[in-house]
Each structure stands twice: as C-alpha cells, then as structure tokens.
C-alpha cells in the first residue's frame, strides 16, 4: 500500500503515469537476489480483480456517449481481436513450427486486449472526449472476446485439431458467450439498482455495490457466458439508472469508495506484473535461443499487431464517416417526412362535422384517431431529434486521421495480457517462450507507447477537449432546469411570495442553485450566468402565470401574483421542513428533466454531469441539514 501511495505521489512530479512507475518498481523488486521468483494465480486477476475494475469503469461511462460509439467499440472489441489473434497465430506457427496454429492463436488472443493505462495517459493529455470514450469502450469488451477466443484455441490445441478453429464456430461461441453474459448482466443491473434504491444507509449500499460485479460474473461463467461482459453490462445499467433511483448521498459515498478500491486494484495489477517478470525470464532462459529469441519474436509480433491495428482503424474511420453521411441524409429525409406529416395532421384537425358525418365517423372516434397519430408524430420527432443531436456530436468531435493515430498508438498491452498468458495450459508446447513473448510485448508496449503517447499527441495535434461549456449550451441547460420548476410547489410559492425576498431570507436556494449548477470557475462568468438564470427563470414563471393574473398585474399593482414580505414574515410563513421539501421537489424535477434531456442527446455528457453533480450537492446539503435540525 505504501508503494502505491509513493508512486501516486511521485507520478505527477516526474510526468509519468503511476502504473508505469509501479511496473518499474515491481521489476526492480522482482530481480533482487534476495527475492525468490513470484508466481500469482492468474485466476485471481481474471476472476477476482477484473470484474470490479470493469464494473467500475462501466458505471463511470456516460451511457449516452457509449450508445453513440457502440459501432466503433464493437468493431474494435470483436473483429479486430479475431484478426490480430489469427495473424499472430499464423506468423508464429511459420517462425516456430513447434508451436501449432491453435497455440499460436491462443497467444494471439492473449496479445489482443488493450490496457486501461492508455486511457489515463490520454486523459491527462487532454484529448477529445470522443477518443476517450472509444478507448474506454474498447477496453470494456475486448478482454471478454479475447478470453473466449483463448479458451476455444486452447481446447483446439489440446485436442490437436486445427479444424476446431473454424471462424464460423468461433464466432458462434463468442456470440453465445456474449449473449448469455449480456442477459445476466442486464438482470443483475436492473434488480441490483432497484434493491439499492431501497437501501438508505450509504455504507450498506456501497457494500452491496461491491458485490454486484461478482453477482453478475459468477453465474455467467457457470452458464457458459463471459463473466467480464456480465459485469460490464451490469455496470452500464447502473450508470443509466442510478441518478434516477439511488439517493445522491448513497451515490456520492459509493463513488468515493469505488475510486479508492479502483486505485488499489489497478496499482496492484501493475506491481504484481513487474514482480512476476523474473520467474518468467528465468524459465525462458533455460530454453535454446533463450531470451534473445523471445525478444526477437516479441518485437516482430508487436509490430505486426500495431500494423494490423493501424490498417483496421483507418478502414473503420472511413466506414464511420460513410455511416455519418448516410445518417445525415436519413435525418434530412425524415425531417421532410415529419413536416409533411404535420401538415396532414393540421389539415385533419380542420375537418368539419359534415365531413365526419359523410364518412360515418363520430367526433370522438376522430379525436381518438388524431391523438393516436399525434403520439406517433411525437415519437418520430423525438427519434429524429436524437439523430440530429448525434450528428452534431459527430461534427463537433470528429474522428479523423489525427484522432485515429492516437487511438492506434494508445492500444497498448498490459497486465491483462500477462494474466491471460499465465492461463495457457502447461501442456502447451514451449509455454515458457509464449509467456516471455507476452511479458516482453506487454512491458515494452507500456513503457514505449506509454512514454511516447503524450509526445505523439503534441505532434499530430488531434481534437482536444475544451473543458468549457458554451454559453448557448449553458442557456439551454438553464431553460430546461427552469422549465422543470413550473409545475412544482416551489413555483406556486414563488408566485405567492416575492421571489427575491425568498432568496434574501434564505428560504429557498433553488433559484440561485440554477446559476451555480452550470456555473464556471471564473467569478465574473459565474455572476453573468447567475443573472442569466434569474432572467430565464423570471420569463418562465411569468409565462406560467395565468392570463387573468397577468392582465390584472398590468392594471393594478396591488393585484400582483407576488407580494412584498419581510424576511421575518417569510420565515413565519414557511417552516424549515416545508422549505426543505419545496427545494427537494424542485431538485427532483430538475434532475428528471436533465435525465430526459440525456436520453434525447440534447446536451454534452460533460455539461450534464456537471449540472447533475451540482444538484446532488444541493440534495446532500438539504438532507444533511435535516439531520442536524433533528
């Protein structure tokens, strides 16, 4: 633990990712004469460490962005893994005939999954959010694909049957494993998040969340599915449902504890990777050719994997661009269809009673039919609006050659490669050589690619994350959050009591919170946004005022819908519990509005996460103050 803390402390000072430092520290300790060869059971990493790590990453993944990048993620996680594995298998079988094709494919499957350390390095370099989403999505699923392929290849190798590597059979096995895992993960996620909604104690909720990845992965493995995919799917379900169903206090508490657990597990993986290196190297040195031959094969196969990845990603980006053009045309065609549908609906609304009578239709039946088509029109319009939001996202976050080069170079291998390699059967020919190749490629990729990735980003200059929310998006957020207040009891209270007095009396923090929810760090910008929030909220509440009240306010100041009250009078009008309930209702209404906007893809995930986090802060503050008052 102290080593992890020390590496975390040193990493930002030397400008190197902490996993790389931990790997070097592990290598240094492992090669000390006083330290014997260390071997850790690989199933501990694959079945105990990886499920919670992938579950945690899936929970942090914005589901809106994952949906948008699902095609790219699927291509990187399945076809690329198959291509890389079979290419490695054929090449090593050609270079080392003693290693049959099935065992070569097994090594290829081991070398296929990318490592999460690349994501932390890319994030720190400030690349666009879309690049991070693609890398994270690939890392969530390619582990499972490679492990399923590894199992099939080892079975073929033990049976000495190369025909068992028929691509059709392998694709079928992968599809079945993924299908079983997705079903179990979805059920565990849906049931688990509902159970967590019933748990009021944050500590108990966090403990239950720690168990969820294993509740998903263990049954999936026993039923022939992928336990890792089950944990990922459960995490994605939690990511989508938690804001609406789990209390803010529970979510915040579990998030902080998961960050600590993730740090310990990830750091432990890289430290143990370095510690195990000496034993693998010592075993390989006993074979003819020894380490030099293993290093040569590692360089050749590592270069082959990167070339395949570069070519595949270039083709994928061209295909994605073609798909974007096709979506644009489809969006425009659907827009014109919706416009024609609306014209026909407007004409249908003007049908008179004589025409209905001539067609033997009652007004009630006609109105029911119109309502049915209105609902259809609304659904089509929402789907097309989502398509338009996706197109805006693709335009603002492009994936061109510059971004593609970052995705290619960030595909480094790591601790998962070494753990998977150690599961290769002891009956495999030249097993020590296979393990050494995996070690050299994983360690070499982490060090070489990990250290040079920031430099590559500076050279190719891909689209970078701005970190700021545009004024237009802030205004739209404020409008959505303000509109959500119209039907709440808080809005009624604001009409009955002067809103400014409510603010100054501290009776309601909701109005000022609207500005803070999307405010910038700059104080001047924050004040400007707060004034915008006040103006937008005033307009919304005035629009919600009844026409009678509005006309009365124009003719008689005494008939206004709000009244002047002193702070003392306001505080006598509302108890603290009433104030708290008004504010909590407003928070829930605004959160629901933001989640609906998320489903429609209206805002960026960064803007939504910031606004939702501010609402969580306010809810936690209100709930905790209630406990203090009592």
Features from the language model and the residues they span:
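Cytosolic C-terminal regulatory domains/tails of membrane transporters and channels
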Residues: 366-377, 461-630
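Transmembrane helical cores of multi-pass secondary ion antiporters/exchangers
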Residues: 1-477, 575, 589, 594-629
């Amino acid at each position: 633990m102290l080593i992890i803390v020390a590496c975390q402390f040193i990493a930002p000072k030397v400008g190197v990712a902490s996993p790389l430092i931990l790997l070097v520290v592990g290598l240094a300790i492992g090669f000390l004469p006083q330290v014997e060869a260390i071997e850790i059971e690989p199933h501990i990493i694959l079945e105990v460490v990886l499920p919670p790590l992938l579950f945690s990453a899936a929970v942090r993944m914005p589901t809106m962005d994952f949906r948008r990048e699902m095609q790219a993620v699927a291509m990187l996680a399945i076809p690329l893994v198959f291509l890389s594995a079979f290419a490695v298998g054929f090449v090593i079988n050609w270079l080392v005939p003693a290693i049959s094709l099935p065992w070569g494919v097994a090594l290829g499957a081991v070398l296929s999954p990318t490592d999460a350390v690349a994501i932390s390095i890319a994030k720190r370099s400030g690349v666009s959010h879309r690049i991070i989403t693609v890398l994270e999505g690939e890392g969530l699923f390619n582990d499972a694909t490679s492990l399923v392929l590894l199992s099939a290849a080892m079975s073929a190798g033990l049976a000495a049957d190369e025909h068992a590597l028929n691509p059709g059979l392998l694709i079928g096995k992968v599809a079945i494993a993924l299908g079983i895992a997705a079903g179990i993960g979805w059920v565990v996620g849906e049931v688990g998040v509902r159970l967590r909604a019933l748990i009021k104690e944050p500590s108990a909720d966090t403990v239950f969340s720690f168990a969820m990845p294993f509740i998903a992965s263990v049954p999936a493995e026993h039923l022939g599915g992928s336990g890792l995919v089950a944990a990922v799917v459960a995490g994605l379900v939690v990511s989508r449902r938690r804001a609406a169903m789990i209390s803010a206090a529970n979510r915040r508490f579990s998030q902080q504890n998961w960050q600590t657990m993730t740090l310990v597990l990830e750091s432990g993986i890289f430290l143990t990777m370095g510690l195990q290196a000496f034993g693998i190297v010592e075993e390989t040195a006993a074979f003819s050719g020894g380490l030099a031959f293993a290093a040569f094969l590692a360089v050749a196969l590592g270069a082959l994997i990167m070339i395949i990845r570069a070519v595949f990603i270039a083709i994928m980006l061209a295909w994605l661009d073609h798909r974007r053009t096709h979506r644009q045309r489809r969006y425009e065609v659907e827009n014109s269809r919706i416009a024609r549908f609306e014209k026909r609906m407007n004409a249908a609304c003007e049908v008179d009673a004589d025409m209905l009578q001539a067609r033997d239709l009652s007004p009630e039946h006609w109105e029911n039919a119109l309502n049915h088509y209105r609902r259809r029109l609304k659904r089509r319009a929402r789907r097309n609006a989502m398509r338009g939001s996706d197109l805006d996202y693709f335009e603002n976050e492009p994936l061109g050659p510059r971004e593609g080069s970052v995705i290619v170079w960030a595909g480094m291998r790591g601790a998962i490669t070494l753990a998977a390699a150690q599961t290769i059967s002891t009956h495999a020919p030249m097993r020590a050589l296979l393990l050494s190749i995996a070690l050299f490629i994983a360690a070499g990729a982490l060090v070489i690619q990990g250290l040079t990735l920031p430099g590559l980003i500076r050279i190719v200059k891909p689209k970078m994350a701005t970190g700021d929310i545009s004024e237009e998006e802030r205004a739209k957020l404020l409008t959505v959050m303000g509109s959500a207040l119209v039907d709440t009891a808080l809005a009624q209270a604001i009409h009955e009591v002067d809103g400014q007095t409510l603010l100054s009396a501290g009776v309601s923090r909701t109005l000022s919170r609207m500005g803070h929810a999307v405010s910038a760090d700059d104080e001047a910008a924050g004040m400007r946004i707060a004034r915008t929030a006040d103006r937008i909220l005033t307009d919304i509440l005035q629009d919600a005022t009844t026409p009678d009240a509005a006309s009365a306010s124009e003719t008689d100041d005494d008939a206004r819908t709000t009244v002047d009250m002193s702070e003392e009078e306001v505080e006598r009008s509302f108890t603290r519990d009433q104030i708290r309930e008004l504010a909590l209702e407003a928070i829930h209404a605004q959160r629901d509005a933001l989640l609906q906007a998320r489903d429609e893809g209206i805002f960026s995930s960064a803007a939504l996460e910031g606004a939702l986090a501010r609402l969580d802060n306010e809810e936690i503050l209100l709930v905790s103050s209630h406990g203090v008052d009592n």
